[in-house]
Amino acid sequence: MLLSSPPVDKRGPQPICMTTMLSPADTPVPADTSILSARYRATTIGMVALVALHAFEALAVAAAMPTVAEALDGLRLYALAFGGTLATSVIGMTLAGRWADHHGPARPLWYGLACFVLGLLLAGFAIRMGMLVAGRLLQGLGAGAISVSLYVMVGRSYPEHHRPKVFAAFSAGWVVPSMIGPALSGLIVQHLGWRWVFLAVPLLAVPAALLLRPALARMQSTAVGDRDDGRGNVVRWASGASLAALLLYFGGQQQGLPALLCIGAAMLALLFCVHRLLPTGTLLLRRGLPSVIALRGIAAAAFFACEAYLPLLLQRERGLSPSWAGAVLSLGALGWFAGSWLQGHQQRGWSRQQLLRVGTAMMTVGIVATLAVLFNPVPLPVALVGWALTGFGMGMIYASLSVLTLSLSAPHEQGANTSALQLSEALSVTTALAVSGALFALFVETAPHTGYVLCLAITCGLAVLATVIARRV
């Protein structure tokens, strides 16, 4: 059988045209593909700087507070100086979310920054402990508003494919302060005085915020007409939730029956309030956004409750020095950044749901491995690897939930939903720490090993629950 030859092109030789299939990695991309391109550079640097300053302030104040309380003769208000900040941040988060949805993120950001800076100045110039506590309450109000406003800015300023990288940068903004913040705070207290722990932050926060002015000016209000945003009701429920959070914090400092009564009453009040503040179905773990909001709270509670007791466990039960116990926590911070970076740069095309399932599984395995060192036959390196793995999983979870919240929200809902995301975290962590703290205080004198086991069982249970919720997102 003869093969016919191809027809001859009478036009003569033609230039050869080769078509190549480009992989996604080889596909040309716009010039502003980086979050540090000219279009986004000032916004990115300004937001990350504010995140880093907030992180440094939180960590540095925690390290300096014993000196502050002694200098102002205010040990009896020591707990309120910490818990009050969290309580007022609940109000700041909630109000900023509603405000940003109706008028854009500029107003809540500027008002939040004003409260934050004024609170720092009030605390820095405090002549008595009551004045310092007032400053801390104002700080919390401002910090809550700033955090929600920044999330809304991410949703309004960056296209969806940039958002994972922005949230990875936010994680980086926490890593450096977590590594050097406490030590730097100690040096400031020792050589400059404790007041500069508060007074130094405004000097940097205001210039960082000014970098955001061009981006904020481009954002328009998403309000439709003059609709009522129900701000009065929001204030009432947010105030109730903040008081319940404060009562939880107070209950966690008590022992025996008073602790149980405080925590029980606070949890009932908290459930009643958050039912009105969180998206419908959050407490029932409905699929979609409600499960995203719930997962943020459960995963954060598991991680931070474990982190609270890990240094104590390593020092008292395994004989590590404070510096080595702190080094273990630093591994978790580095793991968190690595996991957050991976979710923003992974090339396998994993969906956010897949990242959440892998992240929650890694966090659960890491927590179990970390807490296994409660038993002496388990070698200490297991805790090092376990806590790094826990941080890695949490980095994947945390940033992915932030991205999902924005993608599942209409522009006029981003403020309310991001405030619900952070509200879920704050209140869940407070509840977990209060309950575990009360249990630990109950057994620490008579059966400390039992106290550790009960507290760590709570963190493991929360981690397992997080893996279940991740399949409902």
Q: Residue spans of the language-model regions?
A:
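Hydrophobic transmembrane-helix bundles of small-molecule transporters
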Residues: 190-296, 307
